Amino acid sequence: MKVKILQWHAVASWTWDAQDETCGICRMAFDGCCPDCKLPGDDCPLIWGACNHAFHLHCILKWVNSQTSQAHCPMCRREWQFKE
């Protein structure tokens, strides 16, 4: 007895592996994208700091480069360092 597959419709979903569900800077969901991007995914990745807080890449880069942030994490105020 042989089985012949006529059609196959695969469905997949993904989520970021972050403790929070929203970016602490722009307040947009991590499964979406930051205000600067049109589509979520590789062009708008999540970035973790040494303090384990996660943000959209574009959001944290703007935050760290702003004059008022003094390059500190917006959540815990530790000096911002990208997690290796």
UniProtKB/Swiss-Prot annotation:
Keyword ATP-binding: no
Pathway participation: Protein modification; protein ubiquitination
GO BP annotations, alphabetical order: anaphase-promoting complex-dependent catabolic process; cell division; positive regulation of mitotic metaphase/anaphase transition; protein ubiquitination; ubiquitin-dependent protein catabolic process
Principal cellular location given in the protein's record: cytoplasm
ZnF RING-type: positions: 34-77
Entry keywords, A to Z: Cell cycle, Cell division, Cytoplasm, Metal-binding, Mitosis, Nucleus, Ubl conjugation pathway, Zinc, Zinc-finger
Family classification: Belongs to the RING-box family.
Complex formation: Part of the APC/C complex composed of at least 10 subunits. Interacts with APC2.
PANTHER family, per database record: RING BOX
The protein's name in its UniProt record: Anaphase-promoting complex subunit 11
Organism classification: Eukaryota, Viridiplantae, Streptophyta, Embryophyta, Tracheophyta
Gene (UniProt): APC11
